[in-house]
């Protein structure tokens, strides 16, 4: 089986604070993988480097054997991320935001319609599709983050603190 993610000797510092000190990770295609550690251990920094949101100091990061910096568009097309922080798109409805997210990946509204409807249904967001993010509870915002991560059918799903703010019943679902 091919490697979906390969990280070799990854290093990152913020001023004099070392965030990542030569980490190595190999994740096979189709595998479930958890990155665990205390606050400040570098989990989110690793995710942000992998998705191109933060520049690494050194090391190698690959997605399906393609360099994440050289093949940024490919990398972004393969990864869906539900970030730890909520997006700040307060002015548009959830439905519009999901269509915008699909458009970011080159999916036309007409082509995205069935996927958007499916995600609203599966994540229990149908009644909220015309709501604004500012009107949602933390758990509902988290569900919407997951919908955004899935709208372009990525091969890799990254969930950064996916159960924060989610009630116990939904965690089991």
Where are the predicted features?
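Conserved ABC transporter NBD signature motif
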Residues: 59-70, 74-75
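Conserved ABC ATPase "signature" region
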Residues: 99, 103, 110-128
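Conserved ABC ATPase signature
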Residues: 132-136
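Hydrophobic anchor residue at the start of the ABC signature
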Residues: 146
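Conserved catalytic motifs of ABC-family nucleotide-binding domains
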Residues: 153
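Catalytic Walker B motif of ABC-type/P-loop ATPase nucleotide-binding domains
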Residues: 157-160
């Amino acid at each position: 089986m091919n490697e979906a993610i390969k990280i070799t000797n990854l290093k990152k510092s913020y001023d004099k604070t070392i965030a990542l000190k030569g980490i190595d990770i190999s994740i096979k295609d189709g595998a479930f993988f958890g990155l665990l550690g205390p606050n400040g251990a570098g989990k989110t920094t690793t995710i942000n480097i992998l998705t191109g949101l933060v520049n690494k100091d050194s090391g190698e990061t690959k997605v399906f054997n393609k360099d994440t910096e050289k093949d940024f568009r490919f990398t972004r097309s393969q990864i869906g991320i539900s970030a730890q922080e909520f997006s700040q798109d307060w002015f548009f409805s959830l439905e519009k935001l999901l269509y915008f997210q699909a458009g970011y990946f080159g999916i036309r509204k007409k082509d995205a319609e069935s996927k958007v409807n499916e995600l609203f249904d599966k994540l229990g967001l149908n009644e909220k599709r015309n709501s604004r993010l500012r009107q949602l509870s933390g758990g509902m915002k988290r569900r919407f983050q997951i919908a955004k991560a899935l709208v372009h059918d990525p091969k890799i799903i990254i969930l950064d603190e996916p159960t924060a703010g989610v009630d116990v019943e939904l965690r089991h679902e």
